[in-house]
From Swiss-Prot:
Start and end residues of each stretch annotated as Disordered: 95-126
Gene coding for it: 34
Transmembrane segments: none
Protein family (similarity comment): Belongs to the herpesviridae UL95 family.
UniProt name for this protein: Gene 34 protein
Comp. bias (Acidic residues): 106-116
Species per Swiss-Prot/TrEMBL record: Equine herpesvirus 2 (strain 86/87)
Coiled-coil stretches noted in the UniProt entry, renumbered to this chain: none
Cited InterPro entries: Herpes_UL95
């Protein structure tokens, strides 16, 4: 063995010493636990340490599984999610995937109803769950401001490009953007809204991160716009209950037509919380301190948001995936102070 080690290491003393030490340790393991480790010399002048991690089968030779064993209650969430992803990917590769903003085909509806291709019933798969919602500096600062004119102008500039209109059922997005950012239901309805207590009016609803950056992905913005508006307002225009007519800068008839077309859009289970970012962070602070319970994604303020972090960090174990999710807490008073200083908001 030692002559072989010298030849293999080409005279490298350090490598030769490591080779000898490794083989010696392997031999010692095999001698100590002969039923678990085996050392095999390969034809290419090396050694292979094989470990037996399978339990010994000590059942009687004539034994057999109990008849009528029922394992239908055993669930493996990770394998179920993997199967759902494979099925979705197979559907898109076969040309069955719906375009952005359009209703999916019959095969996708069958999958949503919980019926596989073979016809056997199965449980519907829940949508993928993320433990964290990360908002970069640009996004969470826009989420705090009531004035969303810059977001609308940015979206209109991107939608002026024909390439961003591919695969969408929307023809007039401006009424939808106005509803989502300035409609009567687009503000926090928490009776103890901290934003209202500070500035005299409720804060804007917290939307997904990509809704504040239309220039980065106009297609995602347009698809998210359809889902969010349908979640908050439905598909019928409520007139004065939806908007303040005196503030709308275009013909009110465009609202009815734009909302009517949302009936052909698959909302994909979209849900918009009826709280602003400040109230969401306040609830997260209570969860991090263990004052209240709850579930859902944890909001993370990226970029300059790290200066608002406090020392309290809560944890929660996901019963479905087994992961540990963190709930950071934030100094809400400091966030509102900086917002007031930058935007000049007053009660």
């Amino acid at each position: 063995m030692f002559a072989l080690a010298s030849m293999t290491t080409s005279g490298d003393e350090a490598l030769n010493a490591r080779y000898k030490e490794s083989v010696s340790l392997s031999v010692g393991l095999c001698e100590s636990l002969p039923e678990q480790f085996k050392l095999i010399e390969t034809p290419i002048n090396s050694f292979l340490l094989v470990a037996n991690v399978m339990p010994n089968d000590d059942r009687p030779w004539d034994s057999h599984p109990a008849s009528g064993a029922d394992f239908h209650n055993i669930r493996m969430p990770r394998l179920e999610r993997l199967r759902a992803l494979i099925r979705c990917d197979r559907g898109y590769n076969n040309g069955k995937g719906g375009e952005a903003g359009q209703r999916a085909g019959e095969d996708d509806e069958r999958m949503d109803e919980g019926v596989p291709e073979e016809g056997a019933p199965r449980s519907p798969h829940p949508p993928p769950f993320a433990h964290y919602e990360v908002y970069d500096s640009w996004s969470w600062q826009r989420a705090l401001r009531v004035d969303k004119d810059d977001v609308i102008r940015e979206a209109v500039a991107e939608l002026a490009k024909p390439a961003n209109w591919q695969g969408t059922a929307v023809e007039d997005p401006l009424p939808l953007m106005w509803l989502l950012f300035y409609g009567r239901r687009s503000f926090c309805d928490d009776p103890e809204c901290l934003y209202r207590a500070r500035f005299g009016h409720p804060g804007p609803l917290l939307l997904p991160n990509y809704m504040y950056r239309p220039a980065e992905d106009a297609s995602s913005f347009l698809a998210g716009l359809c889902r969010c508006v349908r979640s908050v307002y439905g598909c019928e225009f409520g007139g004065g209950s939806h908007v303040n007519p005196a503030q709308v800068p275009f013909d009110h008839g465009r609202f009815s037509e734009a909302l009517r077309k949302l009936g052909a859009v698959d909302d994909a289970g979209a849900y918009v919380s009826r709280q602003c970012l400040v109230c969401r962070l306040y609830r997260q602070n209570l969860m991090s301190r263990g004052i209240i319970g709850g579930r859902g994604s944890s909001i993370v303020l990226g970029g300059s948001g790290k200066k608002y972090l406090t020392r309290e960090v809560g944890t929660r174990r996901c019963l479905e995936l087994g992961d540990i999710a963190l709930y950071p807490s934030y100094d809400i008073s400091l966030i509102l102070d900086d917002l007031e200083a930058s935007d000049g908001l007053r009660q």
